[in-house]
Amino acid sequence: MSIDFKKYIASVKDFPNEGIIFRDITPILQDGEAFAAATHEIAEYAKSRQADVIVGPEARGFLVGTPVAIELGIGFVPARKPHKLPREVEAAAYDLEYGSNVLEMHKDAIKPGQRVVICDDLMATAGTMHATKELIERLGGKVVGAAFYIELTDLKGREKFPDVDIFSLVQYTGA
């Protein structure tokens, strides 16, 4: 059975700032069938990319990536915001649609040569993906794909990564 995931995404105007339409994935997470279907579709994608490990950026990447890793029986590595990891880290800065931040990963989180699929809720300007990919590559991993619940195509994030296969459940163009 195919699910229309757009039915499970709430569009919230002027959040977190005026002029932004926030695409809220929590209705997918709240519906067991939709959540399982989204997880399965992304897991099938990651399997097709022969992923050894899933990396998810904080915070919603944890919600997307962890169940995918469980379904595939592979590891999950969190890319965290600053000062959340207790051991030695590698860090990368990035810009968002409405701010900037830093992501960190433990220096031993990715083994050299591991095939990595990045999982997150949304691809917009691709700042988060850029920082996540940079960290993975610095640690010796190979990004073989990226999967998102939502892609905002007008922001052209995909175009910044011609060398990465990108999958999204839902695409939005315009407002």
Swiss-Prot record:
InterPro entries for the chain: Ade_phspho_trans, PRibTrfase_dom, PRTase-like, UPRTase/APRTase
Catalytic activity: AMP + diphosphate = 5-phospho-alpha-D-ribose 1-diphosphate + adenine
Cited Pfam families: Pribosyltran
Superkingdom, taxonomy of origin: Bacteria
Subcellular location as annotated: Cytoplasm
CDD domains found in the cross-reference section: PRTases_typeI
GO biological process: adenine salvage; AMP salvage; purine ribonucleoside salvage
A Gene Ontology molecular function term of the record: adenine binding
Its EC number(s): 2.4.2.7
Key words of the record: Cytoplasm, Glycosyltransferase, Purine salvage, Transferase
GO CC, any one term: cytoplasm
Pathway where it operates: Purine metabolism; AMP biosynthesis via salvage pathway; AMP from adenine: step 1/1
PROSITE patterns xref list: PUR_PYR_PR_TRANSFER
Keyword Cytoplasm on entry: yes
Alphabetical list of NCBIfam families matching this protein: apt (TIGR01090), PRK02304.1-2 (NF002633), PRK02304.1-3 (NF002634), PRK02304.1-5 (NF002636)
Family, as annotated: Belongs to the purine/pyrimidine phosphoribosyltransferase family.
Quaternary structure and interacting proteins, as annotated: Homodimer.
Function as written in the Swiss-Prot or TrEMBL entry: Catalyzes a salvage reaction resulting in the formation of AMP, that is energically less costly than de novo synthesis.
UniProt name for this protein: Adenine phosphoribosyltransferase
